[in-house]
């Protein structure tokens, strides 16, 4: 009900429910409102891969918590195929050595994502972007792929301070102050 009311109050013409977390909320929303909605096929990794444009993006992604080797990091978070990875601990360059490969892969993913988004026939105006529990990383990188502004409407937003300088518009139903003392 909260989500539907926010969409109505802000007169948002496009409503997207992010994949997995948005499946059931989309079904419930459609029981209340006949307005067309989109089950938006995404994941944080897919959005990040497509949205990276420069070294600052690479550094931001690298700053996120990850417990794995450099090779796993390159494969899992930056989308590099194993045949493009030749890790040498001796050169000490880490991710810098793979900058061009990361950005080249991002360009390919970006074009694919833009084709997918174009197929959705997005109307002029904002997009309400539902995610259940998130920081806003997926939304930030998806925002780079379309001209419409995204308004994140989350059930719970994690670590809002982590995204405070990223100009991501998010409103949460359940605030982090309300999570203090919860299980």
Predicted segments with their positions:
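Long, low-complexity, Lys/Arg-enriched
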Residues: 1-183
């Amino acid at each position: 009900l909260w989500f539907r009311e926010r969409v109505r109050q802000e007169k948002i013409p496009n409503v997207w429910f992010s994949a997995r977390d948005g499946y059931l909320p989309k079904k419930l929303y459609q029981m209340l409102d006949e307005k067309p909605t989109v089950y938006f096929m995404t994941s944080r990794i897919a959005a990040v891969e497509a949205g990276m444009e420069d070294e600052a993006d690479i550094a931001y992604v690298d700053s996120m918590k990850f417990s794995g080797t450099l090779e796993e990091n390159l494969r899992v978070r930056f989308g590099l195929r194993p045949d493009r990875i030749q890790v040498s601990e001796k050169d000490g360059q880490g991710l810098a050595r793979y900058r061009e490969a990361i950005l080249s892969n991002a360009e390919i993913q970006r074009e694919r994502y833009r084709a997918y988004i174009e197929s959705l026939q997005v109307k002029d105006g904002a997009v309400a972007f539902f995610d259940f529990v998130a920081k806003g990383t997926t939304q930030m990188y998806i925002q780079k792929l379309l001209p419409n502004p995204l308004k994140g409407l989350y059930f719970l937003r994690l670590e809002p301070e982590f995204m405070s300088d990223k100009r991501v518009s998010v409103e949460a139903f359940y605030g982090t102050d309300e999570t203090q003392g919860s299980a």
